[in-house]
Amino acid sequence: MEIPPSPPPETAAYTLTTSSISYTIPKTSLSLLRFPATEPPSFILRNITLTAHPTEILAVVGPSGAGKSTLLDILASKTSPTSGSILLNSIPINPSSYRKISSYVPQHDSFFPLLTVSETFSFAACLLLPNPSIVSETVTSLLSELNLTHLSHTRLAQGLSGGERRRVSIGLSLLHDPCFLLLDEPTSGLDSKSAFDVIHILKSIAVSRQRTVILSIHQPSFKILSIIDRLLLLSKGTVVYHGRLDSLEGFLLFKGFTVPPQLNSLEYAMEILQELRESDGNTDATALPSIENRKQREKQSIVRYRKSRITEISLLARRFWKIIYRTRQLLLTNALEALVVGLVLGTIYINIGIGKAGIEKRFGMFAFTLTFLLSSTTETLPIFINERPILLRETSSGIYRLSSHILANTLVFLPYLFVISIIYSVSVYFLIGLCPTWQAFGYFVLVIWIILLMANSFVLFLSSLAPNYITGTSLVTILLAAFFLFSGYFISKESLPKYWLFMYFFSMYKYALDALLINEYSCLASKCLVWLEEAQTKICMVTGGDVLKKKGLHEKQRWFNVYVLLGFFVLYRVLCFLALLRRVSGSKR
């Protein structure tokens, strides 16, 4: 049965119950050989049964490795249990509908550092709230509820403590007024006062909004315990105790343990977890994975977005532009870099001429241009990698479509990189003395622009794969070096071993270099570049057309190379989308 998708906030009150939840990791040592595993699956959780009520905080407590985060993932419908069921008011949940009335706050905060607290809330509210007219009122009310009003215009990169950043994370999860709030170790990394303030605010939210709060916590202080309503004490994936804190001491006495006067009951229970597990005969579970149960839940996990794709792209593009505008130093650096490199290159090759030396210099100048343009975009790699956790959190939560993010990113970088391409082209083209026609200059700008877009897509794709900045930088460096090596600049296609020939056709450098050469020497196709003087006669030895023919090029290939470069641009965007989609799917599974 399916829960009501949009319950009224005033009356919605759900009691969440789990019945014999188990989660296993199958033995995979022989799975690659398609032989059945000889060992039983490894249990992460065994027979977890719990109840969480509205207006209350249920704290999942236990040592590291007890299964707290896995249980939170299951309760947040991010992971499907291998057996057991989750019920709301005694009705089995539908994961798709359940996500609409629940919200999950991960352990690590991730925001755009250049946005203010108010802007961060407003962006999410525009995508989550049905009526745009209530966005401002909702954000103002939420800032007040979280005691963040005085920080509303403070950027997240500066001036916020760990506790305040954690409250921003909680605020983002409250924007659509969920019935359930699930938090993975919200006090992790906070001092005692900040940790207490966070739990106190969560308790206020639970009571004032009639909501259910479930959180995991490693070992809460006595002050925090005074706020928490119920405990679920885990040890090695099994329930040791589930109930109120004031009943824990009686439970320990029943088991034959007396709480020492210097410890509270939870501290003592944490010290004797092994003995408590051994004394409990109900912790041995024989639940086996239910593949059908998991498949059925995955079929139901269809995310329905609240806004149209056009609205998502518009809002995301505005956020991108705002962030780019606030990185004015990076903007200025990119523009100055293009201008200075263009002028330096132009003065080195000034009035290059068209003779034999000019042919060699043009080839070298074009090769350097490609190396500079393709390598200059690597500075965006750390930005993309730092933004990736935010993207995964927002898309896995169903705030917007992943494809909308890719399209908005593309729309923002199109004009930005076009300006950079014009700055570089103007500074280098006329100083060197390349083909003096506006048609050739326009084509040169177009090729430079597409090269920058292609390089940007390439870096974006690698940033979706790389686990960190160091690995990403290594990948970019190695692949760009390989593409340059097989571009035909160092070794011709005819000289390549057959088993490396595929790299010649996969090289981005090859098509960009061909496009620049065709543009230049098509202009000089009938012009003699090298003369042979004999007995007062001059014989033309090399024309522009001969240069192209020697490189295996033809004027008719002018637009073919542009189309291939555009194909690389689209290909790397699609590959980036697929890589991120896999990551998002992994965070939802």
From Swiss-Prot:
Residues 16-261 form the ABC transporter domain. It is a multi-pass membrane protein. It comes from the Eukaryota. GO terms for cellular component: membrane. Its main location: membrane. ATP binds at residues 62-69. The keyword ATP-binding applies. It holds the Pfam family ABC_tran. InterPro entries: AAA+_ATPase (IPR003593), ABC2_TM (IPR013525), ABC_transporter-like_ATP-bd (IPR003439), ABC_transporter-like_CS (IPR017871), ABCG_dom (IPR043926), ABCG_transporters (IPR050352), P-loop_NTPase (IPR027417). Residues 311-521 form the ABC transmembrane type-2 domain. It is found in: Membrane. Keywords: ATP-binding, Membrane, Nucleotide-binding, Transmembrane, Transmembrane helix, Transport. The keyword ATP-binding applies. The chain crosses the membrane at residues 335-355, 365-385, 412-432, 441-461, 470-490, 499-519, 560-580. GO terms for molecular function: ABC-type transporter activity; ATP binding; ATP hydrolysis activity. Coiled coil: none annotated. PROSITE patterns: ABC_TRANSPORTER_1, ABC_TRANSPORTER_2. Belongs to the ABC transporter superfamily. ABCG family. Eye pigment precursor importer (TC 3.A.1.204) subfamily. This is ABC transporter G family member 8. The gene is ABCG8.
